[in-house]
């Protein structure tokens, strides 16, 4: 029951509770720290992505810098009075040109008093978030408390009583105290919130899919917060969205938004319901951008759950990211969190090109500068453009994988091409009017709109893109320092199978010489006979998928091309191509999405997915000795009773037959399992989730 009636209209939250409700990846700048303000990102924040065009239209011909260096004057942690959604008001003051040389330490906002600098908390407060099930959100029902939350966050329960029961008091984001009855009962026994929970659900208008957050502050006070699930205009649930930007032609839609849901969103005005949308008006963006460009102080409202990237970014992060000379082929990793912010997962990707996301409306802006491709495209198929400071560079060039036929004592080097000396010819164009500096600016990077690099056979990859070889001969004069020029006049390269990129150069251009890293002994002798064009790699003949297919029975591939169908319908073909010297090279051709089918996991590992999530949690099956240990781990991980898992655990074998785990030895199950998905049962068994293990052969 509610014990506090009226609350003051503007009330600052406890920063610890605010951060727990905002999510683990949210980091607020500290007062007096230096940040960059991106009006382009602010416009996305106001309209879920389509606001950039509207902001540019309202600003008209006025010159607007792509980013403005500011000092944080203050931060207020607040919550919406109606929805309990947390947000912050950040007061910013543009840094005058004369102050740009003065450096101050940039720190993240400590969990102290709102708006003031404070000593960092000695330890992170304990919190727990759970996505509400249909049973939890039922009117008149109770809340099933995961054991971890009950034992570490709630007050200690006296298990000697029969039944163990206590009253729990929790304060929400508005300072209102709620009273719940906590009892440990049932068969099997579990922790429940009964009396008072139904009132809380009705008052907060909670539905299945929303998340509840419990936090124990460093002072021992129990707090409760809410993370509402995103909803479509039609009332349905929306997947985790983080990158909606329909105003940018190719620049990032929802991070985990499937094609069908994307179409549904477009059918309802291109946005649906999104947290933060409607709270930040476009007029506020225009006003803030105008004040920032004129050097006057201004204030912005920031909604951490609005599913758009931060538009107030720590200055040191931006400067460090833009000192990197970004170019296609670089490998990186990027963090994403689940909808309920319970897990943060890192995903690997490759930069495909470097270009301004919207050169017409926001020229010279580093916002969403990197176009990327992902190792797991089925999960991140719509995240196409990201900002450099959001990724962590793993390798500046694609890795070199030496096959077993290569001698470990030999040094791998790219032979010089007569028409393209490699040293001293790489250009570093920069942005015009770059506020971060002149020609030695950290905003230097390589322009590239071509696909990333030569991806050879899986046994041998090296990171010098073929288009770089051809730059000197074809279009070296098209690039010059000081701009990002799109190479529209260049014939786009043709992609051969997955990972092979061969430029559409004239026939007399010796492509095989550019791809050949070999010794004279293994080089093939040319003759007057008509030969099939091929690629030479380490002195071995690499045949394309089209050549293998067209060769049929006339050209021998030992032992031939075999097709293995993966569970997701993608074929994986392998073939052995003879090089004429008695040895052969095994080449793997995989269609788009094959790498995602095995999830890039090591042997004995698999990923576990909740039905409502698109980001999995990796577990190591090799540490378990039996199904019982696995059941216990899943029960602790998802807050599901162990008995329910035992009764409803099924898996599908390679033939597609659904079986009970008891029919297969655990050792076989451990070797084959790659993906486990926890799905809800039908309406009659809504409280007894069905766990389906989708098994794929490695």
Curated annotation (Swiss-Prot):
Tissue: Expressed in roots, culms, leaves and young panicles.
Compositional bias (Polar residues): 549-577
Record's subcellular location: Nucleus
DNA-binding span(s): 128-230
Key words of the record: Auxin signaling pathway, DNA-binding, Nucleus, Transcription, Transcription regulation
Keyword Transcription listed: yes
Main location: nucleus
Region of interest (Disordered), residue spans: 549-579
Domain annotation PB1: ranges: 603-683
Known function: Auxin response factors (ARFs) are transcriptional factors that bind specifically to the DNA sequence 5'-TGTCTC-3' found in the auxin-responsive promoter elements (AuxREs).
Assembly mode: Homodimers and heterodimers.
Free-text domain note: Interactions between auxin response factors (ARFs) and Aux/IAA proteins occur through their C-terminal dimerization domains III and IV.
Matching PANTHER family: AUXIN RESPONSE FACTOR 22, AUXIN RESPONSE FACTOR 4-RELATED
Protein name per its UniProtKB record: Auxin response factor 22
